[in-house]
């Protein structure tokens, strides 16, 4: 493909921490593959071609160089480009949405732990509404009745990531997987229907949600002790709403590795990797069919970003600086969230 399509190879830039920290066998397998690939492409020959033909034994393609040490290969080795793996699998490929809420702050020994903090979190939302039939938004989201959590990341404690797009509306679209643990071990999985769960919760507490009003109005009047169950249950449903990757254990279903986005995309749909799994033989569908495929797709997009950087900054008069190939998280999110590759 490199020869036929004038293509590049894009790989994860797995740092020294990965190579030191993984199991010895896994580390050795990866390094062996990396070395073999570089060596193979250093002088690529096609056996079926004549000796003096391009690609023949006397005129092989030199597509890489042999580094003194694989540790010092940098961001590029000929046609092989190395890009950081950050935010490539747990990301919505259609909108660039990532979940950067720092939910660890709200964890505790029980589901009703830190009720005050969870209430403050919910009140920091821009709005919490139920989208009912008859509203403009109902038409926009494909005639679905869903709950909508609108928020601005600037109003929350998040991981140390700067997102170019901070305002989002997360809908309770699709199912999520809740992992159940016992004694610190993954016991089994539970399938959550977010919308059904929230409807039951609202009805249990006699909240008139169907009129589409901002449910924060009800939360603001709630006593944290008497309504701890409601506050914490609503918080949990929100937490699973923004959970993109949903996997089951190998014992349950080793092939279940699904990405479901709560964000409405430009096609007025929601990205669900299972939609593309069912149509994987249909070449008109180009979106990733599972979380692993999404990682590969986004790694490729980062490679495209670097190629564009080279084109924009190349000059025959001066040496191209290696740090020009560095792509930080903010640049990457801007690239995918604002669809700068289209």
Language-model segments: what does each one mean?
Residues 1-342:
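Positively charged, helix-rich recognition surfaces that bind polyanionic ligands
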């Amino acid at each position: 493909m490199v020869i036929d399509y004038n293509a590049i190879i894009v790989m994860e830039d797995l740092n020294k921490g990965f190579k030191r920290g993984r199991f010895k066998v896994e580390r050795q397998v990866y390094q062996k593959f990396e070395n073999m690939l570089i060596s193979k492409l250093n002088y690529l020959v096609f056996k079926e071609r004549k000796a003096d033909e391009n690609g023949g034994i006397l005129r092989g393609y030199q597509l890489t160089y042999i580094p003194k040490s694989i540790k010092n290969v940098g961001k590029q080795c000929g046609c092989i480009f190395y890009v950081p793996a950050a935010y490539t699998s747990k990301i919505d490929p259609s909108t660039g949405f990532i979940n950067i809420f720092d939910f660890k702050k709200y964890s505790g020994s029980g589901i009703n732990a830190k009720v005050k903090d969870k209430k403050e979190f919910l009140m920091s939302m821009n709005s919490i509404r139920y989208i009912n039939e008859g509203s403009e938004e109902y038409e926009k989201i494909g005639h679905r009745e869903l709950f909508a959590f609108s928020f601005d990341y600037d109003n929350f404690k998040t991981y140390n990531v700067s997102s170019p797009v901070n305002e989002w509306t997360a809908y309770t679209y699709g199912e999520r997987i809740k992992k159940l643990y016992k004694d610190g071990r993954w016991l089994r999985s539970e399938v959550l229907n977010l919308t059904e769960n929230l409807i039951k919760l609202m009805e249990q507490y006699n909240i008139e949600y169907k009129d589409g009003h901002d449910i924060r109005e009800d939360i603001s009047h709630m006593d944290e002790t008497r309504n701890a169950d409601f506050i914490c249950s609503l918080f949990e449903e929100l937490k699973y709403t923004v959970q993109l990757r949903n996997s089951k254990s190998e014992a349950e279903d080793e092939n279940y590795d699904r990405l479901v986005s709560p964000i409405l995309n430009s096609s007025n749909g929601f990205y669900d990797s299972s939609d593309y799994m069912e149509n994987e033989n249909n070449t008109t569908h180009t979106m990733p069919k599972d979380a692993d495929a999404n990682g590969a797709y986004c790694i490729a997009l980062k490679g495209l970003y670097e190629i564009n950087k080279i084109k924009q900054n190349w000059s025959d008069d001066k040496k191209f600086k290696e740090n020009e190939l560095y792509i930080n998280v903010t640049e990457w999110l801007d690239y995918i969230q604002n669809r700068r590759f289209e």
